[in-house]
Amino acid sequence: MSVSVPRLVAWETTRRCNLRCGHCRANAGNCGCDGELSFAEAKALVDGIASFAKPILILTGGEPLLCEWIFDIAGYAKAKGLRPVLGTNATLIDAATAKKIAEAGIGRISVSLDFPDAKRHDAFRGVDGAFEAAKRGIANATEAGIEVQINTTVTKKNRDLVGEMHDLAARLGAKAFHPFLLVPAGRGKSLEDAGLSAQEYENTLGFICRLASESKLEIKPTDAPQYQRIIRQQCGDAVCTGKGCLAGTGFAFVGHTGDVQPCGYFEFRAGNIREKPFPEIWRDAKVFADLRNPDLLKGKCGLCEYRSVCGGCRARALAASGDYLAEEPFCAHVPDRVLLKELQENFPVVDRPYAEIGKRLGIDERQCHERTMSLTRRGMIRRIGASLNPGKIGYSSTLVAFKVPPERLDEVAQKVSAYEEVTHNYSRDNEWNLWFTIVAENRGAVKRVVETLKRECGVSDALELPAEKTYKLKAVFS
């Protein structure tokens, strides 16, 4: 199987940082860390990436501007055909630094702002004055011709402020607004209580989808693969070209000591560039191979009709269960196959069955009924009702098999399914390729339906297998 090349590679240039953010994945701080890559090793990393791909190279940290050769490595990456961008808190960007960023070939910086005011932002970032310093840095970058992307980490504390943060980004002259949905990694583990519930994720991403349809900014939620499902549900497949989780398929993360991970929040070591070149790790690591195969996904992610465009957040699955292929723990969507299974196996005989089923699946009665009707319109459900034993109520039944030319199978199947006397209709992979059951008030009526269908469908080869003894088997279609 051919392996795609990475579209983005994030490299943690250092773990030093002048802020103390409560959610920091890297648990970064003022002190340096032993074992960080040297400039020579950084050049070797760039050479390895450039040997087989030309991705966006995200220079991140910590605070990458505290890496003494950050501009040299950015320029080197640019010369190799990569597109360097900078993930910075912007507090260190004065006019001179902004000029150096631009001269190094860095065309965009991403800056994290989490609240629309200094008091709350500074508290979240752990340093007084961080908000105003970041705004000054953004202004200096914009003046130097550098594009600015504003990132906002969304938690319970600011989920109702996403619209305000978007408006702030626009006022600051940003080109893009990327809401980040909290992943419990690094110091972020201590903020798990501030993380959104599955339904809050759903509601927040729905709001962002509507915001994106009206905004002049580029809006892209990050660490939110469910967004690709939501925009398809709200806008349709025609306007959707993106994919959810890119970990291991289009994205990789290189840590400050050379460890390679599927993403920065995905705390699983795929290899180390000091031991093996980056291209080999990308091509051969088992975790990457697993992530490239959606058939390996488990739980409701494995059953989901959106698994190829969403995939669930593998970092959240790993953090919650220890298994990166487990189901996404913060997804409220009920896959079609899960609903179908519940309808077939556990349909309740009560006054309001859809309320009962919805309660079991975590959706409301209206949504459960509408989803069921949608499955019916799409042909996945033929009927919902009691299955009676024809012989017990004086009726007759027979199993019929038609021999249909393969090119006419769909046409004939539709004609057969249109008859209310037909209770089952399915294909089999042999010469008798269309099978169905007919139930009518007596044997003569059954015979008339069979003859009418043969005539209307232009079929001469038919088997009639009338029921002699009934055996009830539990058949569930997935």
Predicted features along the sequence, with ranges:
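Flexible glycine/acidic-rich beta-alpha junction loops that bind and position SAM and/or redox cofactors
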Residues: A176-L196, K220-Q234, R269, E468-V476
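Radical SAM/AdoMet-radical enzyme domain recognition
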Residues: F39-T60, L66-P184, L196-S197
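Short, small/polar residue-rich loop motifs at catalytic or cofactor-binding pockets
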Residues: C245-T249
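Radical SAM enzyme core and accessory elements
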Residues: M1-S4, G255-C263, F268-I273, L297-K341
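C-terminal accessory region of radical SAM enzymes
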Residues: Q199-Q233, D259-G312
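Canonical Radical SAM [4Fe-4S] cluster-binding loop centered on the CxxxCxxC motif
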Residues: V3-F39
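A compositional/biophysical signature of low hydrophobicity enriched in polar/charged and small residues
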Residues: D336-S478
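A short acidic, helix-capping loop that chelates divalent metal ions and anchors anionic groups
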Residues: N30-G32, D117-F124, G186-L191, L434
